[in-house]
Design a protein with these regions (language model features):
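Hydrophobic transmembrane alpha-helices of multi-pass small-molecule transporters
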Residues: 1-96, 216, 220, 226-365, ...
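Hydrophobic, membrane-inserted alpha-helices
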Residues: 17-20, 41-48, 135-141, 188-191, ...
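Membrane-embedded alpha-helical segments and adjacent helix-loop junctions characteristic
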Residues: 28, 59-172, 334, 338-417
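Re-entrant/interfacial helical elements at transmembrane boundaries that shape
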Residues: 65, 150-166, 185, 198-217, ...
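Alpha-helical transmembrane segments
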Residues: 91-101, 146-156, 228-244, 423-435
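Alpha-helical transmembrane segments of multi-pass membrane proteins
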Residues: 97, 129-143, 169-196, 222-231, ...
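C-terminal transmembrane helix pair
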Residues: 167-173, 233, 346-350, 360, ...
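Membrane-core helix-loop-helix motifs of multi-pass transport proteins
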Residues: 168-256, 446-479, 489
Length: 489
């Protein structure tokens, strides 16, 4: 019956029921427009359908786009409503994600990915845990000079991780992801939010945090690059040290000990022989991507020579096509890229209009006022604000949108309730990256790695929640002590 219908009846019914309940039964709160409330109903229904696997996520997204267009929640004019529903397909972030996946195919096709994987194994391959730490440290080394966390985690580290997993025949298509691919994919991803929190230049929205903090405090607090890096150094390193161990405990790989891995890797490298033409071109393009993503031209020659992260991705893909390393058929066959572009665009669109229609602003103001009247002191109030701010990211498909919508209101509320400005600024700044752990649509890196198929949706969300708790605890406890020692509050 499920095959004939094209959807699973029970999860589809639950998703529809939730949407109808919010739309028709729960009254529209004061201060919220009917359009915003109805869009929330659809958003909740879509997320429920995705979680319940009522249909493939891309198919659900097509239906979501149709519903936004036909209900007219964003515009009374049908043509404008359709434009709104498709608006995120023009988002540079969406295409950065998709093109990063396409580029990673070149690393695998040429064999360069396997070569890098074997080199990693020869050095760190005695234990799977050691390979996990090597991926995390690679992320950390790249983070200060890679402003796109999607490019870093999805375009640079992820192909290497896939190559290592493949070398142990850990492949989702073969049902062998549990050997080590699942664990390594989770380490690959959860390195990303931690390193993003450690440097202003590690993810695009961090400068926005700096700007909001400065404006809210009338420039009394300005988080410079060095101040931010020093503040996040100790808690960040502690989080990086804990993360592979925590994931190892909850998602232990089937292959734990690899005592012969170094010799095995050397044999494989010998079998590969000298680098092929394709590998050399791929390596050169890889270097070009890294240089441009790191913003080296702008550093050397000024802002006029800055290259956008998505433009960089298209440069890389264009060079791969021109050189013949990848063909257009290769691009067309990269189903996960096209699937990711579709579903991520739909979710970003819905989250964007929840913000534009004022629902997120209403929610932030309501929560801030409610906490203020509890009379629980600045510590309790700040804790509630921090938790509400971070876990509200379940409703967002963009960290930039989330920070824009909520950071200022929540930070101002914390200051009004007596929170030390520098302490609360650093905690909120850390939470702005830690919240990326939560879902498979939380940031650009998540759909790239989740789309590789190493984990189920339930496993991804469970790991995300666990790591959000661990990371937040580390930054609150270690951070608070470290920042006190530095005299920040």
């Amino acid at each position: 019956m499920e095959e004939k219908l094209g959807f699973k009846p029970l999860p589809a019914a639950i998703a529809l029921g939730l949407a109808l309940l919010i739309w028709f039964v729960i009254p529209v709160p004061e201060g919220v427009t009917p359009q915003a409330w109805h869009l929330l109903a659809m958003f909740v229904g879509v997320i429920a359908a995705i979680i319940g696997k009522a249909m493939p996520i891309g198919a659900i997204s097509i239906i979501a786009i149709m519903l936004v267009a036909i209900t007219g929640v964003t515009s009374d004019k049908p043509a404008d409503a359709m434009k709104d529903a498709l608006s995120s397909f023009s988002s540079p972030l969406i295409w950065l994600i998709g093109v990063a996946i396409m580029i990673s195919r070149g690393i695998l096709k040429t064999g360069l990915g396997a070569r890098i994987g074997y080199l990693f194994i020869s050095v760190f391959g005695k234990k799977t845990l050691g390979i996990g730490y090597s991926l995390a440290l690679s992320e950390l080394l790249l983070a200060p000079v890679t402003p796109s966390n999607t490019a870093r985690g999805g375009g640079i580290i992820h192909p290497v991780m896939k190559a290592i997993a493949s070398s142990y025949d850990s492949d989702p298509e073969k049902g062998t992801q549990g050997r080590m691919g699942k664990y390594l994919a989770l380490v690959n991803y959860h390195s990303n939010p931690i390193t993003s929190a450690m440097f202003i230049t590690a993810t695009a929205p961090n400068p926005l945090v700096v700007d909001i903090v400065a404006k809210t405090t009338n420039t009394n607090i300005h988080l410079s690059w060095s101040t931010w890096a020093l503040a996040m150094l100790l808690p960040g390193l502690a989080a990086i040290a804990l993360m592979p161990l925590v994931l190892y405990f909850f998602y232990p790989p089937e292959i734990k000990q690899t005592p012969n891995a170094a010799e095995f890797a050397k044999q494989k490298l010998a079998e590969q022989g000298p680098m092929s033409r394709g590998e050399k071109i791929m390596l050169a393009i890889f270097a070009i991507l890294l240089i441009l993503w790191a913003g080296v031209p702008a550093m050397l020659f000024g802002k006029a020579y800055a290259v956008d992260a998505t433009t960089t991705a298209f440069i890389g893909l264009s060079l791969l096509l021109l050189s013949g390393v990848l063909t257009w058929d290769d691009i067309l066959k990269e189903k996960s890229a096209w699937d990711t572009i579709t579903w991520f665009a739909a979710l970003v669109m819905m989250a964007t209009f929840l913000n534009k229609l004022g629902l997120i602003t209403w929610f932030s103001a309501m929560l801030s006022n409610s906490i203020e009247h509890l009379g629980i002191g600045w510590m309790g109030a700040s804790a509630l604000l921090l938790l509400a701010y971070m876990y509200a990211h379940y409703m967002f498909a963009s960290t930039t949108a989330h920070i824009t919508a909520m950071f200022g209101a929540f930070y101002a509320a914390g200051l009004a309730l007596g929170a030390p400005p520098m302490l609360f600024a650093l905690l909120m700044a850390a939470a702005s990256s830690i919240m990326m752990t939560l879902t498979h649509y939380a940031t650009g890196t998540s759909p790239v790695i989740f789309g590789s198929g190493y984990t189920t949706l339930a496993e991804w969300w469970k790991a995300g929640f666990i790591m959000s708790v661990v990371n937040l605890a580390v930054f609150v406890i270690v951070g608070a002590v470290w920042w006190k020692m530095l005299g920040y509050y």
